[in-house]
Amino acid sequence: MSALKNKIDFALVFTATNANPNGDPLDGNRPRTDFRGIGEVTDVCLKRKIRNRLLDLGESIFVQSDDRRADDYRSLKDRADGCKELAECAKKKEKNRAEYAKIACKTWYDVRAFGQVFAFKEKKGSDDENSDSVSIGIRGPVTIQTAVSCDTVNITSTQITKSVNLETGKDPDQKAPDTMGMKHRVDFGLYTTFGSVNVQQAEKTGFSEEDAEKLKQAMLTIFVNDETSARPSGSMEVVKLVWWKHNCPT
C-alpha cells in the first residue's frame, strides 16, 4: 500500500426527510438540535455509520456495534485478546507500546483511521487499583466534525400506540400504559459536516492512499444498510461529497 502524501479535506452534504437522523437519549430520543433549533448529527454517530459501511465492504473493524458485529466477540477486550499477535505482545514482561500500537493499526482499519484508546486490566475480574493494566492511546489521522443543518429544523412529534400489551395484566382486555409512546422526526433538514485526513498522523498509523479511497467510498454510501423505523429507506440521502486533495502534506 502506498503512503498518504497529501493532506485531504472533505465536506459531506446530506438530507433527512421525515426521519430522525440522530436521537438524543437525554431528550426522549428527539432529533438533536442546539439552542437555536439548528439540527445536529454528532461525529460519533457519523463514525459509527462509516464503521458499519466499512464492515459491509469487508474491512476489519475493532469497534463493532453489538447488532452489527461480524465475529463472536462481545467486548473490545475480547476482540483485542482474540488477535494472536496483540495478545502475545500484551503478555510480554517488558511491554512495547509502539509495537502494540503498530499491530493494532495493522489489524483494524478504524484504529489506524480514527485512533483508539486501549485501556484494559490484565488480571481478569480484578478491581484492585494496583492491578496491572495496559493503557495505550493511538491518535488517528481522520477527524470529522459534528454535522449541522443549514437552517433550523422543524420537529414533528407523533403519539403512537402498540396493538398488544408487553405483559399480561390482571385484565387482559385493558390497555397497559406501555402501549403508548412518542415518535419524533425532522420534516426536512440539509446537513453538512467537514473533516480531514492528517498526513503526519497517517504516517504513524499506516493509513494509506488506498485507505483514504475506501473512506471516500464509505462516505458516499454512508446510509446504505442503515435503515430503521426512525430512518426509513430513502429518508437519508447523500447530496454531495466534496473531496479536496492538497498538493502538499499540510
PLM features per residue range, with description:
Residues 1-250:
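RNA-binding basic/glycine-rich loop and surface signature characteristic of RAMP-family CRISPR effectors
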